[in-house]
From Swiss-Prot:
Amino acids binding ATP: 30-37
Cited InterPro entries: DNA-binding_RecF (IPR001238), DNA-binding_RecF_CS (IPR018078), P-loop_NTPase (IPR027417), RecF/RecN/SMC_N (IPR003395), RecF_2 (IPR042174)
NCBIfam families recorded: recf (TIGR00611)
Organism this protein belongs to: Xanthomonas oryzae pv. oryzae (strain KACC10331 / KXO85)
Name by which UniProt lists this protein: DNA replication and repair protein RecF
Family: Belongs to the RecF family.
Region forming the signal peptide: none
Main localization (coarse): cytoplasm
Lineage: Bacteria, Pseudomonadati, Pseudomonadota, Gammaproteobacteria, Lysobacterales
Length: 368
């Protein structure tokens, strides 16, 4: 898929900006603070329903404005015969998000997220590796969400059961009142876990070759999965029953896929905790690129790839390795930098450049 039009209204420093990116390589340059990241942030908002730079109240809406709007028009479909144009709009009124997809209001933003797939690497992406389990669970679920049509319904089923069980636990409900939700949680949770495990196994096969190319010094060798309970010993139904008294005391559910995690393993390092910040960023980027490749294989089309401030996140050597790998893929890429990255210096006509300055985005001629 590739974005044909991105319109941004009243987001951070932008009053009104419209961008028509090319279907291949797009580089947005400008000084620090010019607004390059905000362009990718707008695209990320549409694809994820949230910003990677904080909450709405952290300055997402332009100062003095009451709302913000983002519009995206893109083509999707793995072949010319199946290609179609999609259009989506997202608005925050200052109180809540609302969205439209192909001319219809959407009841949930998940409909927008399911329609437009964007893989984003930004300065905070290292938390995928160095942070807690939540971003890693979200990473797995994003991949499943986009390649398995029924996954969202399964995930919602589990989350609903978890919320109901936790509410009963906080109320100090009698044990028999938990039985129905324990059954629902166990049934949906076992299926959810099996899906996650299969996906991670498949992702590992794609990740190791990617990591060997962009960061061979890491020696990334495997991904291991922790399901959120001792699955090799007991079923989830039994784990919930065994933990019931403790859960009633604590007021929350301690066992299940909402506690799951996964970890990378390395031949030359003792574990993810031994990684430097730069190594964590490289590992995270390798995971994201492997996920993009898996999406492309399963869906017969690439997601949009957004790389923010690559120059400050990676040294020139690793930038060149990453971009060399990406240039060979038929994916649309939007990259921000203060100058042309070393891996794109010879891109020639393949590279479409935009300059961001004073709240405006302008297409640059090849000779600029």
């Amino acid at each position: 898929m590739h974005v044909m039009r991105l319109s941004i209204h009243r987001l951070r420093r932008f009053q009104t900006v419209e961008l028509h990116p090319a279907s291949a390589l797009n580089l947005l340059t400008g000084d620090n603070g010019a607004g390059k990241t905000s362009v990718l942030e707008a695209l990320h908002l549409m694809a994820y329903g949230r910003s990677f730079r904080g909450r709405v109240r952290d300055g997402l809406i332009q100062q003095g404005a009451n709302d913000l709007e983002v519009f995206v028009e893109w083509k999707e479909g793995g072949s010319a015969a199946g290609e179609r144009t999609r259009r989506a709009g997202l608005r925050h009124s200052g109180q809540e998000w609302t969205g439209r997809l192909d001319g219809e209001d959407v009841a949930q933003l998940g409909s927008l997220c399911a329609a437009l797939a964007v893989v984003t690497f930004e300065p905070g992406s290292h938390v995928l590796i160095s942070g807690g389990g939540e971003p890693r669970r979200r990473f797995l679920d994003w991949g499943l969400f986009h390649v398995e049509p029924d996954f969202l319904a399964l995930w919602r089923r589990y989350v609903r059961a978890l919320k109901q069980r936790n509410a009963l636990l906080k109320q100090g409900a009698q044990p028999r009142m938990l039985d129905a939700w324990d059954h629902e949680l166990a049934e949906s949770g076992e299926t959810l876990t099996s899906r996650r495990m299969r996906y991670l196994e498949r992702l590992q096969d794609r990740l190791i070759p990617v990591a060997d190319v962009i960061a061979p010094s890491l020696g990334l060798s495997a991904l291991t999965f922790a399901p959120g309970w001792k699955r090799h010993e007991v079923s989830l139904a039994d784990a919930l029953l065994l933990a019931r008294d403790r859960d009633r005391q604590n007021g929350y559910t301690s066992q299940g896929p909402h506690r799951a995690d996964w970890m990378p393993h390395f031949d030359v390092l003792p574990g993810k905790d031994a990684l430097s910040r730069g190594q964590a960023k490289l590992t995270a980027l390798a995971c994201l690129l492997a996920q993009a490749e898996d999406f492309a294989f399963e869906r017969s089309e690439w997601p949009v790839i957004a790389l923010d401030d690559l120059g400050s996140e990676l040294d020139r050597h690793h930038q060149a390795r990453v971009l060399h790998r990406l240039v060979s893929a038929p994916a649309q890429m939007l990259i921000t930098a203060t100058e042309i990255p070393p891996g794109l210096a010879d891109a020639g006509a393949l590279l479409h450049r935009f300059h961001v300055e004073h709240g405006q985005v302008a297409l640059q001629a090849p000779s600029d």
